[in-house]
From Swiss-Prot:
One of the record's GO cellular component terms: TIM22 mitochondrial import inner membrane insertion complex
Single biological process term from Gene Ontology: protein insertion into mitochondrial inner membrane
The protein's name in its UniProt record: Mitochondrial import inner membrane translocase subunit TIM22
Keyword check for Transport: yes
InterPro entries: TIM22
Subcellular localization, as worded in the UniProt entry: Mitochondrion inner membrane
Family membership: Belongs to the Tim17/Tim22/Tim23 family.
Source species: Yarrowia lipolytica (strain CLIB 122 / E 150) (Yeast)
Amino acid sequence: MSAFGFPGGGAPTPPQGSFWDMTPEQQGMYSANLIMGTMQSCPGKSVMAGVTGFGLGGVFGLFMASMAYDAPVGMGVQTMSDLPFKQQMKIQFTDMGKRAWSSAKNFGFIGGVFSGTECCIESLRAKNDIWNGVAAGCLTGGGLAVKAGPQAALVGCAGFAAFSAAIDVYMRSDNKAPPSTDEDL
C-alpha cells in the first residue's frame, strides 16, 4: 500500500488482452482483486464507513423518533392529543423523517471522517495498533467541536479518543493465542 492507502500500481492489469478475452475464472479473480484493492484503500474505507454510518444512523434516528412521546420539534403544537388522529400521524411521520435524515447525515459524516483519518494515520505510521484509532478519534472529535471553541474541541478530542481506545481494546482482546488445554479456560 502506498501513500494514504491508494494501491501502488493502480488497478491490477489483466493477464492477457482485454477483460472479455479472459476465462470466467480469470475474470472472477481480476474482479475480486479490483474490489479488494478498492476496499483496502483509504478512500474505499471512508466511503464504506460513511455509507454504513448513514444507513445505521437513519435506522437509529427512526427508532429514536418513534420512542419520543413529546411534541415534534418546530411544529408549533402544544399537545398532540388535542389534534385529530390523521394530523397526529402526519406530524409524527414528518418528524420521524427529519430525525432519521439528521441522524443519518451525522453518523455518515462521523464514520467517513473517522475511518479516513484512521486509515491515513495508519498509512503514514505504517503500523496497525491502538494509537491509530486514538489519534483519529482525537482529530475527529476535536474537528467536529472546533466551532464551539477550544475548550469544546479539547473535550471532543478527549472523548472521541477515549471511546476509540475503549473500542480498540475490546476488539483486540480476542487476538490472543487459543488455550492449550480445556483446563486453561
